[in-house]
A protein has these predicted regions:
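Solvent-exposed loop/turn segments at secondary-structure junctions
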Residues: 37-41, 100-104, 138-142, 177-181, ...
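Conserved small/polar residues in nucleotide/adenosyl-binding loops
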Residues: 205-212
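N-terminal, intrinsically disordered, polar/charged segments of Gram-positive cell-envelope systems
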Residues: 1-28
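Substrate-gating cap/lid alpha-helix
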Residues: 140-175, 198
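Active-site segments of SGNH/GDSL-like serine hydrolases
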Residues: 100-101, 124-155
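Second-shell loop/turn segments in exported
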Residues: 101-110, 146-151, 193-200
């Protein structure tokens, strides 16, 4: 049932970010985007962001957020974790998009949310004044290359994420609902690559930029 794990927007009205008018380039400039390959694609391919305000690590999972050293800074030796990077870059807010690489039939939504929360708390500990916004895991295409991934589990994880945000006083960006085709419950046509049904396309980033 594609509606089985629909998020109750009334229950989480104080947690889910409401749609708002374009906040302008200054909002983007004050924001640090953290995430997996979909975030990496934002600046490596589509120029939606720059290396100054986005850190994306291909294949990275939410559960490794606190510990995985993947960021290099000029003047510093070795690699830094994302929490360490936040402390160095000092953004006004971070928008985190993880979860696609955590999906597994042996990894429950509650375990995922708990592990991910530990990573987000590490970000807060590293730079306490930062505002936390957790982005939903994007939907899959109806045809996708990894048959171990299911849209049902994506929905379960997102439902756990909004509860995690409410429990911790963080904001939740329910972008998945905008990207979904309401008739199928999967990603709208053209919003994920036809080659794998997982990675977001340029069309989506262009639409996002127009809608912000």
């Amino acid at each position: 049932d594609k509606n089985q794990n629909t998020i109750d927007t009334n229950k989480y009205s104080s947690t889910i970010l409401e749609e708002s008018a374009d906040a302008g380039q200054s909002y983007v400039d004050e924001t640090l985007f953290l995430g997996d390959s979909n975030t990496a694609r934002m600046y490596r391919i589509f120029n939606y962001c720059s290396y100054d305000n986005a850190i994306g690590s291909v294949g990275m999972s939410g559960k490794s957020l606190a510990t995985y050293a993947c960021v290099q800074f000029q003047g510093y030796s070795g690699y830094k974790t994302m929490p360490e990077a936040v402390a160095l870059m000092q953004p006004r807010r971070v928008i985190l998009t993880f979860g696609t690489n955590d999906l597994s039939s042996s990894y429950s939504a509650s375990s995922f949310a708990s592990d991910y929360a530990n990573g987000i708390k590490a970000v807060q500990d590293a730079y306490p004044s930062v505002d936390i916004i957790v982005n939903a895991i994007p939907p899959l295409g109806q045809q996708h290359s990894n048959q171990n991934l299911t849209q049902t589990q994506v929905d379960e994880y997102n439902k756990a994420l909004v509860q995690m945000c409410q429990d911790n006083g963080w904001k939740f960006l329910n972008s998945a609902e905008v990207l979904k085709d309401s008739s199928t419950g999967y990603a709208k046509s053209g919003y994920v690559l036809s080659s794998d049904g997982i990675h977001l396309t340029c069309l989506l980033y262009t639409s996002d930029a127009a809608d912000e």
